[in-house]
Amino acid sequence: MATKIRLKRQGKKFYAFYRVVVVDSRKKRDGKVIEEIGIYNPNTQPSTIQIKSDRAQYWLGVGAQPSEPVFKLLNITGDWQKYKGLEGAEGTLKTVEAGPDAEARIAAVENQAQKLKAAKSEAAAKAKAEAEAAAAAEEAPAEEAAEEAPAEA
């Protein structure tokens, strides 16, 4: 069976992302696949490329031919160099590092969540205290009315 490693389109109009799949070369672009070996999302900055290296190595080893876009992705991740035994097997894939801005946003969100939790618990405590006060106020007139009724009789 002639197998290819190619992209399977998903997503919506003007916002496509792809799955890297192994498929029989005679099947449709988005048809039944043999195995999914990765994800490619060109819409993020930098583009998201996740390829299972061991599965890509296996399929390249048994003769699967990558399409041109997948060939470029395999070069970026370093899987093609690893398969061919070339230098640069670490790849040139860029990753997004969590900078101080991201850490500050995370801290702000956690702080906001703690404030909301504290406000919610205070509101619950106030509501409970008001309910107890209202219950005590209702019981007091009822007791006075009960005491006055037998006195008149």
From Swiss-Prot:
Q: Where is this region: Disordered?
A: 130-153
Q: Where is the composition biased (Acidic residues)?
A: 140-153
Give any GO molecular function from the UniProt entry: structural constituent of ribosome
The UniProt entry, under Gene3D superfamilies, shows: 3.30.1320.10
Q: Which domain of life is it from?
A: Bacteria
Tell me the keywords, alphabetical order.
Ribonucleoprotein, Ribosomal protein
One of its GO biological process terms is: translation
Question: Can you supply one Gene Ontology CC term for this chain's record?
Answer: cytoplasm
Q: Fetch the Pfam families from UniProt.
A: Ribosomal_S16
Record keywords: Transferase included?
Answer: no
Q: Which PANTHER family match?
A: 30S RIBOSOMAL PROTEIN S16 (PTHR12919), SMALL RIBOSOMAL SUBUNIT PROTEIN BS16M (PTHR12919:SF20)
| Family assignment from sequence similarity | Belongs to the bacterial ribosomal protein bS16 family.
The name this protein carries in UniProt is Small ribosomal subunit protein bS16
User: Source organism lineage?
Assistant: Bacteria, Bacillati, Actinomycetota, Actinomycetes, Bifidobacteriales
